[in-house]
Amino acid sequence: MEVLVKAGGIYCFGFVIFHLMFWRIFNWGEDLKTLSFLNRAIMQVVNLSLTFAFVIFGYISLFHSRALLETALGHSLLVLMSLFWLLRAIQQVVFFKLKHWGSAIFLGVFLLGAVLYGVPAGNAIYPLQQSAHSGLGPRL
């Protein structure tokens, strides 16, 4: 499971690079000029804030993977990171409608993120439920 969590960290750092390239990829230097000052600022602030969230996800995944797998807080973070990517996949369908092949590829990429964190999350939580029935205490 630790390999999946660390792979999730690399995956998140891939999104850090991708989001930092938005200005070049999407020609934001020109395209954002068509927006109002407020909307232009919001787009850039949201993108940079999301990029920092990916740095956090990636850092925790790479350097604190054991804590993610072995602590209650870590289990919660794994579930939340998996839900983040699942919700992003749903948003891909809702807002991009999968009308372009690239949109379908991104759907798969976002579902991969949900799996990279969801499988370890499920595996980490299930043993916690089993430990209550391990013979160490009364069975409820």
Model-derived features with residue positions:
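Membrane-helix boundary connector in multi-pass membrane proteins
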Residues: 86-105, 123
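Interfacial loop at the N-terminal end of multi-pass membrane proteins
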Residues: 23-48, 67-70, 128-136
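Juxtamembrane boundary at the C-terminal end of a transmembrane helix
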Residues: 117-140
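Final/C-terminal transmembrane alpha-helix of multipass membrane proteins
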Residues: 104-122
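Core segments of alpha-helical transmembrane spans in multipass integral membrane proteins
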Residues: 10, 14-23, 38-66, 79-87
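Interfacial segments of alpha-helical transmembrane regions
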Residues: 1-13, 74-77
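Juxtamembrane helix-break-helix junctions at the cytosolic face
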Residues: 58-75, 93-96
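Sequence termini and other peripheral, non-core segments
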Residues: 1, 13, 86, 90, ...
